[in-house]
Amino acid sequence: MNILYVPLDERPCNAIYPEQTAAVNQTMNVLSVPQALLGNKKKPANIYGIRSFIKKNIVNCSYAIISTEMLLYGGLLPSRLHHLTEADLNKYEVFLRGIKKEFPDKKIFLSNLIMRTPKYNSSDEEPDYYEQYGEAIFRYGWLKDKAARDTLDEREESEWNQLKETLPKDVIFDYETRRAFNVQVNLLHVQLVAENIVSFVSVPQDDSAPYGYTAMDQSKVYSEIANKRLKDRIMVYPGADEVGFTLLARAYNDHLGKTPSLFVRYSATFGAQIVPLYEDRPINESLKAHVLAAGFRLVDDVKDAEFVLEYNTPGKKMQESWDQLATKDVTYDSYRHLLSFVLEIQADLAVGKKVGICDAAFANGGEMELIELLDEKGILEEILSYKAWNTNCNSLGSSLAGLAFCQATFNKEKVKENLLANIYEDLFYQAIIRKQITDNVLPEKGLNYFYLGDKADEISGLVVSLIQKYHRFTLKNSFIDDVFTIDQVTFPWNRMFEICCTVKNKES
């Protein structure tokens, strides 16, 4: 089975890791766009080169998984910066219709984000004016939406009037014009699904909030989906960078003609009801959407489940991962009994269940205590998938994919490679090492979180040594045979936010 794959952007979470996760399965092959055609951060990809790649290679594939951000705009960040016209949108539509006409038996799965609205001043991933006006733009959209749907109090009314006076008109015009175009693209996809040109569309929302530009856009898209009665083929939910994982899992389950049964076990009593950082709804509501999007079905009894997703959540309040080292909220212990959770995982494994862990107790990284307990019980290497990166839904979507590919025949050594690589990056790097280096090393070298200059190789070497240190201190009963080694650690976009960390088996 071959799947053609066009990623959201060139970062490993989109262009490398989904394919690596799928590679554990020995019955499927992912044909990805060559790296040379992809862009670099704000520099757009070679859009027409990618379209040629699709036309040339789709003939040998059963499914085409395509990111609209890549195919139309040239990547995720270019989708927030573009000045495309109706003519560009028409060419995009003609291309998709032409592919379906020429290859009617191919299933096209699209992803298309609802554009985010960050609440802070930074132009790192946004237009240049976001460096000065980002927070104000967020508040402008929030108050504009709330005024239309609800009531502003006196303080909000005053702030709203002040923003209308102080925010440059050309900034608002540019921002709102781009958002309107992007919503037009979302609505085009609704029509293409209605006509069966596209089989399925995933519409993740990045950094959601109850009010604001993203909520306004979401409402327009929701309404059109409902009007055309397409909620089973176009799904809107929180997420972004996990969408490649999700659609690969959906394609594989669709190919098998299966909706695998999944039981979800939460680590905390209130875990399902917690609204995570950077998201707009309870964890359990996002879970329902991601399960359907990936092609699974939920069951209420673990005995009926082929897979068990062990969902590590906060007890009551979610913090950032680096807070666990010094300022962990007491409710992580008083509202959650982590040892009981680990013993339940051990029991699931003992009866032969296929188990994956979505570690969403903290935002932007994993929980050290969980991994230590799994290691102490000697069950860490039995886990099929461990994900704990960025947002709750990033971890959730990729966790489901990690389980989906462990159907039929799968390579257990590759599963272990991925497991260890995720522990290295999601736990050791994101939760611990990243902040240590940002606070203690970068300033003395004249560097910062967003820019590593010409010192990326030097910082990479330090990261590798620290990962190895935390491996020795943390994994006392797991991965102790020295079979696996770090293949590489690099910095996408030359910044500290994420790394590309790959692990290889020295004996293969």
Where do the PLM segments sit?
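An N-terminal assembly and electron-transfer interface module characteristic of large anaerobic redox
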Residues: 1-508
